[in-house]
UniProtKB/Swiss-Prot annotation:
Residues 338-350 have a biased composition (Polar residues). The lineage of its organism: Eukaryota, Viridiplantae, Streptophyta, Embryophyta, Tracheophyta. Residues 351-360, 388-402 have a biased composition (Basic and acidic residues). It comes from Arabidopsis thaliana. Residues 391-440 form the bHLH domain. Homodimer. It is found in: Nucleus. One of its GO terms (molecular function) is DNA-binding transcription factor activity. This is Transcription factor ABA-INDUCIBLE bHLH-TYPE. In seedlings, mainly expressed in root tips, cotyledons, hypocotyls, and leaves, as well as its guard cells. In adult plant, detectable in stems, flowers, and siliques. Induction: Transiently by ABA and polyethylene glycol (PEG). InterPro entries: AIB/MYC-like, bHLH_dom, HLH_DNA-bd_sf, MYC/MYB_N.
Length: 566
């Protein structure tokens, strides 16, 4: 088959291979048309999405939850070939601690491309897959994505895959009937699946595949987790298929151009890609690998989901102790068995504060480690609080849209106050803002230092003024008044000259002060001390101006008179 006939040019193949890997790229190019023949032939479990969400959105007591959960469901092509196709899935973004682990485990940014380039390439790949697999431009979800992370591209691109029995990770798992547990898929040299490259780029280290009679459950985590047989048995029991009545295969007359159904999802309308395929954002909880070691002493991870009332019979088939009211079921992934209690009154009661009146009796399932918790009301998930009178909070899609709108508004506000912007992208704007803030901080520091210096000078000046104020003595003599000003030598303007005279070993005989218009005259009469070197005019001037002694000092002006016995 000529690849160009399928709408794949050389540039498309290069971009898809760089983002998804060569194995995934080759598979998608070869099957982008043949998938039109896939139809769901087995009934689906109405609670499948809730069960998958319980594994991802409900952390256990150790704050652990899986990063993604995908159920590959048994499907059949029109030619009668049995394959495993996308049944449903749930995924979330790594939290801060997990994100740091992803960076240390595997970093594809070292391949030479900038993050913005990777974003454009991922969006382009999703748009290409959407069109080739029968989606229309009106419902192209990739167009509305502002940012596509490695986790999102891994999860969203996975929905276009299917596996023949015995091929790929899920296909081999289903054919053998044995589970697969990879504790370090990132550093593994072998490719467990066509999607290995995408899983590694998303930093997925632990990959678990559990076969059931309806398909294969695939779980993934960025943590490296040791194998837990109790977990395998628990999820195997929970995901047993309830509906075994085959569904009639759609006839050829229902094919009205393009793809009618792909992996059990109607792609002919505007709801080809349901909102449940969105990737959840970061959880606030923290988990450490040491917490996982609790699986050896009945402290394994716990997850919950809210099944419908008709799930009661299924849970009873695996020895689940249930109540006829609405309830919430949790899976306790414990390594060893836990004794079951058939009497709800003997179940352990969770302690509640005085402000919480809701009681939740718990019963345990022996061996499988499944916990049933009775709830009168379904608890709300963490997230945005209800607003405008809504009883339920916003779904993750609308909440994420509003979050991004607020974030964009703040970027616009930031752009308006930063004077010099190098580029218009957000990363450059943040860099310019950081530089501008640092520049302002430097200016503030300089101004603070100047203010402190000015305050110190004023304080010293005021201290000198107060402490060393001259003493004024006034005496009246006949018609004259004698004003005598007495001040310390250190604070007197002529103190430097007098000190220079003392250093020159001369004695001050007399000092006079006179005023002529705007000029003040200081007259000093000095005398050389006995035994000292002869005093010359040059020596005396050098003593008065020590800082300019190396050069020719200015001669005293007419306003300065120096006389003495030389």
């Amino acid at each position: 088959m000529n690849m160009s006939d399928l709408g794949w040019d050389d540039e498309d193949k290069s971009v898809v291979s760089a983002v998804l890997g060569h194995l995934a790229s080759d598979f998608l190019r070869a099957n982008s048309n043949s998938n039109q023949n896939l139809f769901l032939v087995m009934g689906t479990d109405d609670t499948l999405n809730k069960k998958l969400s319980s594994l991802v959105d409900w952390p256990n007591s150790e704050n652990f939850s899986w990063n993604y959960a995908i159920f590959w469901q048994q499907t059949m092509s029109r030619s009668g070939q049995q394959v495993l196709g996308w049944g449903d899935g749930c995924c979330r973004e790594p939290n801060e601690e997990e994100e740091s682990k992803v960076v240390r485990s595997y970093n594809f940014n070292n391949m030479g491309a900038e993050e913005e380039t990777w974003q454009d390439m991922r969006k382009r790949v999703l748009q290409k897959l959407h069109r080739l697999f029968g989606g229309s431009d009106e419902d192209n979800y990739a167009l509305s994505l502002e940012k596509v992370t490695a986790t999102e591209i891994f999860f969203l691109a996975s929905m276009y895959f299917f596996f023949n029995h015995g091929e790929g990770g899920p296909g081999r798992c289903y054919s053998s009937g044995k589970h697969v547990w990879l504790s370090d898929a990132v550093n593994s040299e072998s490719d467990y699946c066509f999607r290995s490259f995408m899983a590694k780029s998303a930093g997925i280290r632990t990959i678990v595949m559990v076969p059931t009679d309806a398909g294969v459950l695939e779980l993934g985590s960025v943590w490296s987790l040791p194998e837990n047989i109790g977990l395998v048995k628990s999820v195997q029991a929970l995901f047993m298929r309830r509906v075994t009545q085959p569904v009639m295969v759609t006839s050829n007359t229902n094919m009205t151009g393009g793809i009618h159904k792909l992996f059990g999802q109607d792609l002919s309308g505007a709801h080809a890609y349901p909102k449940k395929l969105e990737v959840r954002r970061n959880l606030d909880e923290r988990f450490t690998p040491q917490s996982w070691e609790g699986y050896n002493n009945n402290k394994g991870p716990t997850f919950g989901y809210t099944p419908q009332r008709d799930d009661v019979k299924v849970l009873e088939n695996v020895n689940m102790v249930v109540d006829n009211n609405n309830y919430k079921t949790q899976i306790e992934f414990a390594g060893s068995s836990v004794a079951a209690s058939s009497n709800p009154s003997t179940n352990t009661q969770q302690e509640k504060s005085e402000s919480c009146t809701e009681k939740r009796p718990v019963s345990l399932l022996a061996g499988a480690g499944i916990v049933s918790v009775v709830d009168e009301k379904r608890p709300r998930k963490r997230g945005r609080k209800p607003a405008n009178g809504r009883e339920e909070p916003l779904n993750h899609v609308e909440a994420e849209r509003q979050r991004r709108e607020k974030l964009n508004q703040r970027f616009y506000a930031l752009r308006s106050v930063v004077p010099n912007i190098s580029k218009m992208d957000k990363a450059s704007l943040l860099g310019d803002a950081i530089s501008y803030i640092k520049e302002l901080q430097e200016k503030v520091k300089i101004m603070e230092d100047e203010r402190v210096g000015t305050d110190k000078s004023l304080s010293e000046s005021n201290t000198i003024t107060v402490e060393e104020s001259p003493e004024v003595d006034i005496q009246a003599m006949n018609e004259e008044v004698v004003v005598r000003v007495i001040s310390p030598l250190d604070s007197h303007p002529a103190s430097r000259i007098i000190q220079a005279m003392r250093n020159s070993n001369v004695s001050l005989m007399e000092a006079k002060l006179s005023l002529a218009e705007d000029t003040m005259f200081h007259t000093f009469v000095i005398k050389s001390n006995n035994g000292s070197d002869p005093l010359t005019k040059e020596k005396l001037i050098a003593a008065f101006y020590p800082e300019t002694s190396s050069t020719q000092p200015p001669l005293p002006s007419s306003s300065s008179q120096v006389s003495g016995d030389i």
